[in-house]
């Protein structure tokens, strides 16, 4: 009888802890981000559990700057004027159940064919088989959206049934009218089946909108 009561109490405590996690605002969750692992091949992937959100984009699309702004860090994800710096899957742990995953930048012409094929295979395998993956944030430079690889990646994600959110970065480089033109162009190209927003790591434009998307995927509170 006592063991049954102890078991019930443990179950209640576990449920309360889980409820507390879901009540935590997304901003607090992402601010806890810590680098945990770099993956060069499938055998190095961590256990397929919890909730993961991946961030993908062409080399020099502003992907690392987006992650740093989102997590309120200056150098959580390495930024560089040299494209192609992210050469593996980089895992950032948010809490014991949630992770943000920075995928290798694609489309860098100076990368050898063999390495490019390896990256593409690693990305494809991760997106295709990862049960913990709740959604994909695809990053594009608002001035040059829908370049080689962008549409292919978006279509691959949608075919897999993966929730897709497109973020057009460096929006501070364009006026409002040009921004809206870019949003319409990208949304139309994908048939309106993915959500699209503008974003600036410099000014913070679009940060709250991105947080709302991530809150839904990570199953926590917005704000």
Language-model-derived ranges and their functions:
Residues 7, 12-108:
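Conserved G1/Walker A P-loop phosphate-binding module
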Residues 115-118, 141:
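Glycine- and Gly-Pro-enriched alpha-helical subdomains that act as flexible
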Residues 92, 169, 210:
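Residue-level signal for inorganic ion chemistry
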Residues 106-116, 172-175:
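Flexible beta-alpha connector loops of hexameric P-loop NTPases
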Residues 2-6:
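Extreme N-terminal basic, low-complexity initiation segments
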Residues 124-194:
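Conserved C-terminal guanine-recognition region of P-loop GTPase G domains, centered on the G4
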Residues 30-40, 174-223:
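Canonical P-loop GTPase G-domain recognition
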Residues 88-91, 121-129:
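Conserved alpha-helical scaffold flanking the Walker A/P-loop in AAA+ ATPase domains
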């Amino acid at each position: 009888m006592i063991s049954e009561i102890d078991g019930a109490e443990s179950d209640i405590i576990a449920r309360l802890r889980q409820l507390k996690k879901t009540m935590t605002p997304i901003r607090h969750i992402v601010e806890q981000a810590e680098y945990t692992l770099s993956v060069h091949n499938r055998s190095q992937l961590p256990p397929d559990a919890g909730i993961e959100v991946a961030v993908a984009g062409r080399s020099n699309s502003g992907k690392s700057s987006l992650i740093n702004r989102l997590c309120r860090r200056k150098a959580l994800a390495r930024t560089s004027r040299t494209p192609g710096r992210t050469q593996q899957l980089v895992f950032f742990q948010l809490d014991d159940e949630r992770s943000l995953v920075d995928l290798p930048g694609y489309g860098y012409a100076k990368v050898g064919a063999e390495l490019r094929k390896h990256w593409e295979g690693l990305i494809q395998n991760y997106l295709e088989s990862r049960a913990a993956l709740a959604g994909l944030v695809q990053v594009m430079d608002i001035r040059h959206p829908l370049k080689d690889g962008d549409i292919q990646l978006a279509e691959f994600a949608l075919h897999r049934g993966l929730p897709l959110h497109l973020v057009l970065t460096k929006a501070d480089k364009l006026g409002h009218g040009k921004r809206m033109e870019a949003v319409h162009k990208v949304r139309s190209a994908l048939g309106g089946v993915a959500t699209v927003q503008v974003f600036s790591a410099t000014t913070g434009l679009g940060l709250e909108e991105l947080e709302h998307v991530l809150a839904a995927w990570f199953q926590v509170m917005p704000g």
